[in-house]
């Protein structure tokens, strides 16, 4: 026997039992964003490597360590997309969606990062993202956050997630803060780890995101970003908070929240849960007013978020909030005799047409009646619909209950349709 080929490490199969959960999650996401007036956009999995270097930032873990990058046959460097925002901006610029226009867009699909695989974090993962363009005021920041709050309510997990907010201010305010932060960190070089020392000059705000407890200890007395915010950014953030307060959305202001990507400015936010063991981010986003221009378009305000679907599915399963999953088949259609076998798919088509949402699986592969009923039982169907030559001649079918202790019944086809409709709607 030939050696089996295994899936690539960190890239997982999604099997039939799990895909039903994913489909339910995806449907809720689609329905919710559609109710807010957002439109779907789809774009390639492979992009120019330069797109991510220019947008995410060259001195970031994603670009330095995690991207899947390769040269094609022309020698061009290409990358499997590690995130969606930069790709959405590229697609918007290239296709004329953003120039002097407002857009509300969403996307969903696989992303790729070469990280150490662990529960809820994989090398191929699925992301749901939402981006808005052309609106500079805080009301759109609030809408994006309120939309996420609506998602948690739809999933039934509102009590298990919490919102953290911060403002990074304007580029000028951030530059002033960077200078103050670097000056402070230079007084504590003996405490900083090598990673923090490297980031201190290339991207000092990322030091605030350090997981090293010694570094976190010295950051307690570090200069605060809020002390360096420009007046306009302060007003923008206050307006956002006022809108969230009015809507009853609870939040905590976390001045160390900076996000891991270089393109953010002003509003940044994360939705966090403690229900997956260690604290975990379920959804994160913010404002990135400079990115469209940075990638070759006209200066355009923008705000959005992304959420990892693997982690969301894990959270829903941990909290038992997935709800009822529709069974694979409601009816297993068994047949006895060649004539009945030929008529079986025709009768199945009639049932599917006349009984909305009815799922009918037709037996295939031959076998005696006992074997067919055994297959019916394994199919998870509620009933077996049985046809033989006698049933064909009389224009009837026999219904055998598979999950209830009820006597089987023989009915005319129209009566059977009514019974099956009642069965799946009860």
Curated annotation (Swiss-Prot):
It is an enzyme of class 6 (ligase). Pfam families: HGTP_anticodon, tRNA-synt_His. It comes from the Bacteria. InterPro entries: aa-tRNA-synth_II, aa-tRNA-synth_II/BPL/LPL, Anticodon-bd, Anticodon-bd_dom_sf, His-tRNA-ligase, HisRS-like_core, HisRS/HisZ, HisRS_anticodon. It catalyses: tRNA(His) + L-histidine + ATP = L-histidyl-tRNA(His) + AMP + diphosphate + H(+). GO terms for biological process: histidyl-tRNA aminoacylation. The keyword Protein biosynthesis applies. PROSITE patterns: AA_TRNA_LIGASE_II. The keyword Secreted does not apply. Keywords: Aminoacyl-tRNA synthetase, ATP-binding, Cytoplasm, Ligase, Nucleotide-binding, Protein biosynthesis. Disulfide bonds: none annotated. CDD domains: HisRS-like_core, HisRS_anticodon. It is found in: Cytoplasm. GO terms for molecular function: ATP binding; histidine-tRNA ligase activity. Its EC number is 6.1.1.21. One of its GO terms (cellular component) is cytoplasm. Homodimer. Belongs to the class-II aminoacyl-tRNA synthetase family. This is Histidine--tRNA ligase. It comes from Pseudoalteromonas translucida (strain TAC 125).
């Amino acid at each position: 026997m030939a050696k089996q080929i295994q899936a690539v490490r960190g890239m997982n199969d999604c099997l039939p039992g799990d895909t039903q959960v994913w489909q339910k999650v995806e449907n809720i996401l689609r329905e919710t964003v559609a109710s807010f007036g957002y439109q779907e956009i789809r774009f390639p999995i492979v992009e120019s490597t330069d797109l991510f270097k220019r947008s995410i930032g060259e001195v970031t873990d994603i670009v330095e360590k995690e991207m899947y990058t390769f040269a094609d046959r022309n020698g061009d460097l290409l990358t499997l997309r590690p995130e969606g925002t930069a790709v959405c901006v590229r697609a918007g610029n290239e296709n004329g969606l953003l120039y002097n226009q407002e857009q509300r867009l969403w996307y969903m699909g696989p992303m790729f990062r070469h990280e150490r695989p662990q529960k809820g974090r994989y090398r191929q993962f699925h992301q749901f993202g939402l981006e808005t363009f052309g609106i500079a005021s805080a009301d759109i920041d609030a809408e994006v956050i309120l939309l996420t709050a609506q998602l948690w309510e739809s999933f039934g997990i509102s009590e298990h997630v919490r919102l953290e907010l911060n403002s990074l201010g304007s580029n000028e305010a951030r530059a002033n803060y960077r200078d103050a932060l670097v000056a402070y960190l230079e007084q504590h070089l003996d405490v900083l780890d090598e990673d923090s020392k490297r980031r201190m000059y290339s991207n000092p705000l990322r030091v605030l995101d350090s997981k090293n407890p010694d570094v976190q200890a010295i950051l307690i007395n570090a200069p605060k970003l809020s002390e360096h915010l420009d007046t306009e950014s302060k007003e923008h953030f206050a307006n956002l908070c006022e809108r969230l307060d009015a809507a009853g959305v609870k939040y905590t202001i976390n001045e160390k929240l900076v996000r891991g990507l270089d393109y953010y400015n002003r509003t940044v936010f994360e939705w966090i849960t403690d229900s997956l063991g260690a604290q975990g981010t379920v959804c994160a986003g913010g404002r990135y007013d400079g990115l469209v221009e940075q990638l070759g378009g006209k200066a355009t305000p923008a705000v959005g978020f992304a959420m990892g679907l693997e982690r969301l599915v894990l959270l829903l399963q941990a909290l038992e909030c997935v709800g009822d999953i529709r069974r694979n088949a409601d009816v297993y259609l068994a047949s006895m005799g060649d004539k009945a076998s030929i008529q079986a798919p025709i009768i199945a088509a009639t049932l599917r047409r006349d009984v909305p949402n009815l799922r009918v699986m037709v037996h295939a592969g031959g076998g005696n009646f006992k074997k067919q009923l055994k297959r019916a039982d394994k199919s998870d169907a509620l009933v077996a619909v049985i046809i033989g030559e006698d049933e064909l001649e009389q224009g009837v079918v026999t219904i055998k209950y598979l999950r209830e202790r009820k006597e089987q019944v023989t009915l005319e086809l129209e009566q059977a349709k009514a019974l099956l409709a009642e069965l799946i709607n009860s």
